[in-house]
């Protein structure tokens, strides 16, 4: 089976800083694939590059068999690839419902069944649908960012640090929701500093250090890796 997303030997720069150095990985349909590593390892830069916010100096990025390496973000979204960015980035002065509707912008309409689906996954958002998004808690804003991404029925969802800044209880809830999305057939590329949580729900993972992939394997294999335990799991 051909990979849904295929990243091959990409090199990405911030000015003269070589942030991503020859990274290659694949995401197959129905998988959760995680990128783990310390701050500054290049994880978020890779997501920005895949979503078109940055462009690689060299290398290829294929999504559903099409080259998207130098495509603009608005074009990439129409292909079925959405990015839930680090820091949630909700429209603070718009209502919860208006934020959710924005997720369907590329469809040109707001499908009622999609609204019902996200409210069934995130009942707390339904209760707060008329509330300004900026007044939600951090966990609720993360749920809203995820709900907004789901509105366009994407083929691949990329999530950048979904547990950042959340309480342990909310972290559990967010990872439970991500696992449920995978069970319902979603394909997810996850960037997460909480390696323990990420590896427990992921099918495959890649470890990044200073812009390079240094390890890869199944979630279980990396959880049991002594190198990963020492570096990321407190072992």
Model-derived features with residue positions:
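Glycine-rich phosphate-binding loops of nucleotide-dependent enzymes
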Residues: 2-235
């Amino acid at each position: 089976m051909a990979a849904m997303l295929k990243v091959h030997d990409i090199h990405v720069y911030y000015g003269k800083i070589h942030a991503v150095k020859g990274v290659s990985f694949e995401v197959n349909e129905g998988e959760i694939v995680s990128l783990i590593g310390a701050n500054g390892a290049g994880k978020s830069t890779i997501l920005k590059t895949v979503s078109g916010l940055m462009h690689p100096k060299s290398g290829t990025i294929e999504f559903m068999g099409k080259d998207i390496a130098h495509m603009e973000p608005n074009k990439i979204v129409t292909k079925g690839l959405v990015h839930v960015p680090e820091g949630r980035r909700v429209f603070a002065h718009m209502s919860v419902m208006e934020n959710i509707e924005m997720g369907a912008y590329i469809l040109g309409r707001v499908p009622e069944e999609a609204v019902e689906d996200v409210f069934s996954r995130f009942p707390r958002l339904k209760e707060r649908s008329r509330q300004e998004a900026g007044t939600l808690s951090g966990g609720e804003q993360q749920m809203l960012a995820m709900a907004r991404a789901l509105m366009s029925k994407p083929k691949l969802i990329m999530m950048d640090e979904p547990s950042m800044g959340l309480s342990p209880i909310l972290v559990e809830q967010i990872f439970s929701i991500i696992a449920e999305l995978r069970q319902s057939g979603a394909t997810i590329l996850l960037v997460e500093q909480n390696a323990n949580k990420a590896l427990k729900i992921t099918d495959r993972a890649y470890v990044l250090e200073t812009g390079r992939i240094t390890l890869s394997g199944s979630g279980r294999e990396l959880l049991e890796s002594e190198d990963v335990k020492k570096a990321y799991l407190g072992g």
